[in-house]
């Protein structure tokens, strides 16, 4: 019997907004909580454990929130940490540095990928009695992804994702030139729609 109340920390990150797998992951989240989280919480409640749930899905899912949640987590020696990710993932071409994937966390920029190994090492260092880290994602080789053992973005970066090259082009356009620009997407008597785009009349 534990001498004081202990905590089971749940950190769940689920991509429920993805165009291809979002609906499946919505169901996955329901199953995760219905058959896994709630079951474990009930079984451990009689042993003095209370659950603390950090549930990131929909618009709350982001690499920044994942990194912050991992780094800010505090626990006691008899606590339990459960990390669960459902979403897209991958690995760099010919990457032999780890067998574990990098997690997309609802976006697709390489600079924002979160290595599952980093999550494991960070949580292991917290000193809890048990750490469980599960990544329900692909681990296939992905062009454009680079090998990394830790997140490569800074702590103050926001949720607007762009590669360094994209940022440099925008900076060049806005800071290296002066003048005025007037643009239209159609000539007189023409519509703006084309190519059966789903973007709408003003974006095609």
Model feature map: region roles:
Residues 2-98:
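Boundary/activation segment at the start of structured domains
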Residues 3, 7, 123-127, 174-176:
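Short, conserved loop/helix-junction motifs that constitute active-site signature segments
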Residues 10, 14, 40, 83, ...:
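Residue-level detector of buried hydrophobic side-chain packing
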Residues 13-16, 56, 106, 138, ...:
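Short strand-loop junctions, especially beta-strand C-caps/beta-turns
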Residues 29-38, 110-120, 156-167, 203:
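Well-ordered, non-membrane alpha-helical segments in soluble/globular domains
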Residues 48-50, 128, 179-180:
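A generic structural signal for alpha->beta connector loops
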Residues 67-86, 90-148:
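Caspase-like (clan CD) cysteine peptidase catalytic core
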Residues 131-204:
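Active-site-proximal C-terminal subdomain of hydrolase catalytic domains
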């Amino acid at each position: 019997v534990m001498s004081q109340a202990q905590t089971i920390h749940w950190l769940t990150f689920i991509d429920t907004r993805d165009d291809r797998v979002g609906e499946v992951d919505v169901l996955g989240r329901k199953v995760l909580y219905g058959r896994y989280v709630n079951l474990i919480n009930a079984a451990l409640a009689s042993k003095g454990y209370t659950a603390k749930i950090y549930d990131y899905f929909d618009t709350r899912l982001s690499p920044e929130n994942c990194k912050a949640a991992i780094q800010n987590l505090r626990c006691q020696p008899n606590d339990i940490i459960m990390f669960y990710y459902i979403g897209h993932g991958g690995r760099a071409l010919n990457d032999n540095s780890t067998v574990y994937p990098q997690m997309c966390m609802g976006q697709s920029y390489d600079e924002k990928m979160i290595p599952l190994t980093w999550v494991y090492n960070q949580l292991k260092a917290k000193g809890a009695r048990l750490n469980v880290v599960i990544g329900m994602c692909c681990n296939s080789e992905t062009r454009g992804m680079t090998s990394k053992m830790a997140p490569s973005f800074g702590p103050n970066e926001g949720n607007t994702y762009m590669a360094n090259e994209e940022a440099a082009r925008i900076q060049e356009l806005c800071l290296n030139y002066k003048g005025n620009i007037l643009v239209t997407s159609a000539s007189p008597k023409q519509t703006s729609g084309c190519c059966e785009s789903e973007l709408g009349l003003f974006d095609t």
